[in-house]
Amino acid sequence: EKSIPIHYQKTTRIILKGDAPAKYQQGKNTLVIGVRKISEFQSCKPSAHYQLPLVSGCMGMCEYCYLNTQMAKRPYIKIYANSEEIFSKADEYIKSRLPEITIFEGSATSDPLALEPYTHVLEDAILHFAKTKQGRFRFVSKYTDVNSLLTLEHNNHTEIRLSLNIDAVINAYEHRTPPLAKRLDTLKQL
């Protein structure tokens, strides 16, 4: 039987030990659940108007990923427990841009699909944006667990994109991600 260590903290600081490579490895295997301070959303041009901060970090270890530079000091994966507050803030942005459509990117700081079986945050986002008139949601992933998303009523307000590469690139540079065949099977399901 495998034991997963759980640590409860009052502080928001996550302290990783060792040299930089050790901290990176440890961080990639650390899941943090926290509350996101509701402040201004970051711009996400050109793919969307705003980032939708549901998750940060990624369990993948793609050697070329910009998250390695953006989140080098915080390589851990962080799930935000206050998604309803985040959606409410998104609604404020939608209202402020009416009558224009407002697009939110769910994967600017993470690959949230990898965590969907545990969080259901993408399901919540898809259902939320399905109810908005002028809000749209999009995300990209290398991961393949879309089963919980397939039957959702999305009202064509969500766009799911999958990142593809040949197996040689996936094996050499996209560590801890599904192979091409699984990604292609996922595209067929979508």
Which positions does each model-derived feature cover?
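A broadly conserved sequence feature marking short terminus-proximal activation segments
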Residues: K2-I38
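Cysteine-centered iron-sulfur cluster-binding motifs in ferredoxin-type domains/subunits
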Residues: L52-C62
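Short, basic/glycine-rich phosphate-binding loops at helix/coil junctions
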Residues: L162-A168
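Conserved C-terminal portion of the radical SAM core fold
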Residues: A181-L190
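Short, conserved loop/turn and helix-capping segments at secondary-structure boundaries
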Residues: Y80, R176-L180
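Conserved Radical SAM active-site core
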Residues: K23, V32-C44, A48, E63, ...
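Surface-exposed cleft-lining segments at the edges of enzyme active sites
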Residues: S110-A114, A168-T177
